[in-house]
Amino acid sequence: MRPTATPPPIVLLRAVTHAYGSRKALDNVDLALHPRELTFLVGPSGAGKTTLLKLINRETRPTRGQVWVAGIGAHELKASQVAGLRRRVGVVFQDYKLLPRLTALENVAFGLQVSDLSVSNEEAQDRARDALEAVGIGDRTASFPHQLSGGQQQRVAVARAVVAQPPVLIADEPTGNLDQATAWDLMDLFEDIAAWGTAVLVATHNIEIVTRLQRRVVTLVNGRLMRDQPAGHAGRMAWLATS
């Protein structure tokens, strides 16, 4: 039986450097992310993790190098072209960023319509309902954010990020406001999303989760990619993430 071939990368960074003035937030970083893969991005504060996520979502451009997302050269895009790339990248934040006057269903549907103006209200609500069901809170569609627990709010945020079925999902410290049990539930959800075929990249300081899950781990230190460890080899990296 032949081994399963690794699919081509959906995200590719080539010799990427990003500087804020004279300080290099990222320094000559090469990175490839593949479909069906959950990858953790770790490193001390100021290592460049958030900058790397912003480059993938084209919130900023590299000073040097190339950033490719779903075949699109993010580094080449003009401001008027960015929306097309962002439809291919779902984003989950630490603080949820839900609109307080909208229900869970409306928050997810609104996110879809913002990214794709051609979607009708009816289709947006149908797809939002499906997304909420997929992340395990299909029974809370009519709830407002203040009526939901932190874990439930984060699931709404994940549903909003994946409702357009992007090939890439990035998450910036998504467990920062969650207790450990709820954080584990969220990681289970990210593993499910990766199994759907999505490339999932999670920036985190939660070393317990990283070491126990034993997925691929990319370590940044002072803007440099210091280690890229495949699944099953995460236990030896904890000191780098906390130094």
Give the predicted meaning of each segment.
Residues 102-111:
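Short coil-to-helix segment of the ABC ATPase nucleotide-binding domain corresponding to the Q-loop/switch region
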Residues 143-146, 164, 196:
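Conserved signature/switch motifs of ABC ATPase nucleotide-binding domains
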Residues 65-73:
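Conserved ABC transporter NBD signature motif
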Residues 57:
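Helix-to-loop junction immediately C-terminal to a conserved catalytic motif
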Residues 74-90, 121, 193-195, 237-238:
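ABC ATPase NBD coupling module
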Residues 169-172:
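Catalytic Walker B motif of ABC-type/P-loop ATPase nucleotide-binding domains
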